[in-house]
Amino acid sequence: MARNIQSLERAAAMLRLLAGGERRLGLSDIASTLGLAKGTAHGILRSLQAEGFVEQEPASGRYQLGAELLALGNSYLDVHELRARALVWTDDLARSSGEAAYLGVLHQQGVLIVHHVFRPDDSRQVLEVGAMHPLHSTAHGKVISAFDPVAHSEVLEGDRATLTGRTVTEAAAFEEVLDLTRARGWALDLEETWEGVASLAAPVHDRRRMAVGAVGVTGPVERLCPDGAPATELVTAVRDCAAAVSRDLGAGRF
């Protein structure tokens, strides 16, 4: 069994200590409460301070939680609220389309799958929650890249690897794909990530009307795009699902 890293355990203990009780604590209070030497406690606090997890009040020298923790906490809450709001609608999408439905968000130059509804049949399927999908080739990734400025920068600066013979990798051509995605409000992956697989996705917006993720379906290309393009009914179903989740997040009418 792997041993825990002591310095990380101590840093976590400090953050928990600062999160409870008094808002600001001095070095002596922190060291004595955690049973640490002052030098050890000070070194850990300085590292946490450098990362923005801890702030030191100039006048008193006392420590408190930093703004970076709030940002991390908000990111956690945003993703979990998004998933909670999408549960019913993605279930409906999978049922109406007969295909697997996915909800994805931007994470580390890729698409993190945060919710996955199995295709409603008896076939063997693997849960993909937690999986990372490419940002430049998947329908979810294109949608996020088209509507999220951060993702747009990430995908242009990152490696757009050739995954199949259909993958668009050249910058100008990729920008045209994103322009088309913005114009019609959805994106298509037609065997650009996996041979024989197609996907269709639309953006999800929050109360600030910012793109916070993408929802869509994935399945065999012969079912999703039998004539080289998705059926109008499928596009409508995906866009309606994204609009419903967006409304539940406070985005208003889409």
Swiss-Prot record:
Residues 82-251 form the IclR-ED domain. Residues 5-67 form the HTH iclR-type domain. GO terms for biological process: glycerol metabolic process; negative regulation of DNA-templated transcription. One of its GO terms (molecular function) is DNA binding. Gene3D superfamilies: 3.30.450.40, Winged helix-like DNA-binding domain superfamily/Winged helix DNA-binding domain (1.10.10.10). The keyword Phosphoprotein does not apply. InterPro entries: GAF-like_dom_sf (IPR029016), HTH_MetabolicPath_Reg (IPR050707), Tscrpt_reg_IclR_C (IPR014757), Tscrpt_reg_IclR_N (IPR005471), WH-like_DNA-bd_sf (IPR036388), WH_DNA-bd_sf (IPR036390). Keywords: Activator, DNA-binding, Glycerol metabolism, Transcription, Transcription regulation. PROSITE patterns: HTH_ICLR, ICLR_ED. It comes from the Bacteria. The keyword Transcription applies. Residues 27-46 bind DNA. May be an activator protein for the gylABX operon. PANTHER family: HELIX-TURN-HELIX TRANSCRIPTIONAL REGULATOR, ICLR FAMILY (PTHR30136), HTH-TYPE TRANSCRIPTIONAL REPRESSOR ALLR (PTHR30136:SF24). This is Glycerol operon regulatory protein. The gene is gylR.
